[in-house]
């Protein structure tokens, strides 16, 4: 009985506790349901994200990088434009005027396909009033320069061993004549004219702006030059293609003297060092200004091309100083070296220096146009440099760079220059009628041409299709 009483009392107390514990919960829920909905923004106290620094990349996703449209730039160069008197006379027309468009008629497709076309103007153009002359002291007609412009060349190299053939006055005339063609850059020489920014400067420009000439060393070296003038004091021009800056430099080993002429400093770009006391040229030592120019070009340009007039005439092999200078120039920052002067082709070589720099070197392209006798002087080369541009920058495309073998077709009776042809267009019949067969030049045949091509250009030998096919695909 007592147990039953306690059990009943426990059940009663449990029931009362349940009612008191549960009711407030249900009452609060009901009050919440009956309360109006709050529409104001939550305060900082109720919003734990308020005032929190959230990384921007979480809030705003980075836009996707736009794809870079890769493209190619093509640079071509031919060798010595050397107008002997036979060529000068061949350009005389029936009415007595002169025209030299025929010099380039067979390579116009390649000039057109190139973004930058370069020619080495071996014989100076010192002014028609001086009269015309061939070897040993050349002076070529101004109409030859007109033909260069009409053909579409962009850059004319003027630093050669014949540049000083007509003295300083002839050199200045040679340089200045091309100012009538603003699309052409001249590199290798300088004049006293106030030259514009498309070429290098020497002369009165500096006297007017800074009160000192580049010839007045070391005072000129101590100047604090503006950046564009640092470029303009050097021996290079800059050609820009689709935003890519390409520097072109040109120097000559000498002007056919063993000493450097008085008064010539600053007017003709010198490749070799000379003793300031005796002015004797040291042909085995590079002019340190050349390396300084290349280093500056490397800083301000994407691609650096150096065109030295160097080496020994009629040698198929580069001499010791060519090999030494080439490595020094590549060490300084040259991407490409394209040489001239020997009048015959020398090998193409890819050079890697001890410091890891590398560059493509054409030791000599040989002649382009001339009246020389030996058969090997008529085997020539056209450099074709392909530059690939991607989002990481510009670099030489070795797979699509090389040399197109050319042949100057001379006939005899009297001597007549028919033109300069790609070797693949030069036929056995043309070889049989080549002037070297009749004037003691050793004769000409296709086997000989192919042998030279294999030995000198080798893996870098190109065909017309290699060049024109690739160039036609470039946007």
Where are these regions (language model features)?
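Acidic, metal/ion-coordinating pockets
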Residues: 3-28, 41, 47-475
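Juxtamembrane extracytosolic/periplasmic "stalk" immediately C-terminal to the first targeting helix
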Residues: 30-36
């Amino acid at each position: 009985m007592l147990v039953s009483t306690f059990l009943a009392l426990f059940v009663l107390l449990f029931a009362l506790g349940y009612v008191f514990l549960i009711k407030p919960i249900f009452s609060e829920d009901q009050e919440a349901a009956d309360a109006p909905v709050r529409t104001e923004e939550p305060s900082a106290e109720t919003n734990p994200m308020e005032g929190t620094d959230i990384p921007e990349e979480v809030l705003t996703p980075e836009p996707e990088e736009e794809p870079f449209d890769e493209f190619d730039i093509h640079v071509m160069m031919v060798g010595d434009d050397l107008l002997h008197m036979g060529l000068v006379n061949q350009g005389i027309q029936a009415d007595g005027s002169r025209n030299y468009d025929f010099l380039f008629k067979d390579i116009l497709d390649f000039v057109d396909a190139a973004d930058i076309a370069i020619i080495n103007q071996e014989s100076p153009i010192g002014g028609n009033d001086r009269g015309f002359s061939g070897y040993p002291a050349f002076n070529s007609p101004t109409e030859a320069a007109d033909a260069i412009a009409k053909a579409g060349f962009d850059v004319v190299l003027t630093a050669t061993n014949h540049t000083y053939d007509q003295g300083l006055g002839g050199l200045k005339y040679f340089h200045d004549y091309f100012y009538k063609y603003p699309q052409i850059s001249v590199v290798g020489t300088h004049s006293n004219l106030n030259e514009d920014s498309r070429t290098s400067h020497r002369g009165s420009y500096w006297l007017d702006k800074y009160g000192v000439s580049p010839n007045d060393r070391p005072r000129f070296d101590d100047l604090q030059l503006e950046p564009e003038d640092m470029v303009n004091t050097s021996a290079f021009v800059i050609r820009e293609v689709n935003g890519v800056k390409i520097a072109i430099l040109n120097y000559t080993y000498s002007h056919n003297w063993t000493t450097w002429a008085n008064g010539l400093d600053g007017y003709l770009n010198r490749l070799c060092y000379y003793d300031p006391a005796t002015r004797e040229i040291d042909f085995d030592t590079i002019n340190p200004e050349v390396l300084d120019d290349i280093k500056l070009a490397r800083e301000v340009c994407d691609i650096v091309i150096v065109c030295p007039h160097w080496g020994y005439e009629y040698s198929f092999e580069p001499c010791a100083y060519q090999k030494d200078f080439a490595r020094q120039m590549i060490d300084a920052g040259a991407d490409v070296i394209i040489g001239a002067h020997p009048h015959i082709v020398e090998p193409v070589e890819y050079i890697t220096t001890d410091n890891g720099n590398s560059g493509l070197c054409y030791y000599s392209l040989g002649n382009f146009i001339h009246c020389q006798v030996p058969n090997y002087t008529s085997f020539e080369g056209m450099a074709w440099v392909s530059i690939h541009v991607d989002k990481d920058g510009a670099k030489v495309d070795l797979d699509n760079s090389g040399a197109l073998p050319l042949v100057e077709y001379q006939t005899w009776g009297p001597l007549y220059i028919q033109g300069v042809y790609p070797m693949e267009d030069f036929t056995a019949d043309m070889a049989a009628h080549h002037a070297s067969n009749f004037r003691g030049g050793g004769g000409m045949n296709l086997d000989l041409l192919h042998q030279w091509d294999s030995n000198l250009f080798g893996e870098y030998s190109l065909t017309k299709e290699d060049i024109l096919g690739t160039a036609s695909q470039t946007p």
